């Protein structure tokens, strides 16, 4: 992604910091949660992060790695705009993706690796393709 594209994505997200869902059903598990839905739906106007993730993902084709997926809000944001040729690796040390549905969990493009020890070189090399590790 070049600098001009990145600036455009950031600008568009600033002017409309809400996810434009491709599949609104992905957010069904969080829709009635009065704590976390504030963040993903940006109900107070202070949480455009998930919209930015969504917008960035829609402009990327390849492997996406998310570090820290607590509750799964980032996974929802990324998955909704994940291209058919892309993969998502989402890693956390805590196994809590309560808002991620079975459709996402069973998608072969999605790899949710919780309780992941990033310092274990054997696990890292076994999980990722050799050329993708830098």
Regions found by a protein language model. Name each.
Residues 1-134:
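A short alpha-helical cap/connector motif
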């Amino acid at each position: 992604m070049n600098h001009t594209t990145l600036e455009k994505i950031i600008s568009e997200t600033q002017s409309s910091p809400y996810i434009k869902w491709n599949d609104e059903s992905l957010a069904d598990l969080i829709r009635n949660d009065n704590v976390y839905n504030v963040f993903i739906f940006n109900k107070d106007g202070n949480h455009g992060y998930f919209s930015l993730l969504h917008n960035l993902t829609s402009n990327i084709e390849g492997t996406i790695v998310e570090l820290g997926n607590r509750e799964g809000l980032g996974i929802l944001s990324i998955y909704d705009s994940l291209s058919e040729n892309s993969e998502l690796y989402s890693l956390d040390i805590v196994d809590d993706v309560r808002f991620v549905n079975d459709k996402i969990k069973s998608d072969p493009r999605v790899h949710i690796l919780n309780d992941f020890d990033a310092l274990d070189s054997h696990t890292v090399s076994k999980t990722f393709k050799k050329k993708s590790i830098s």
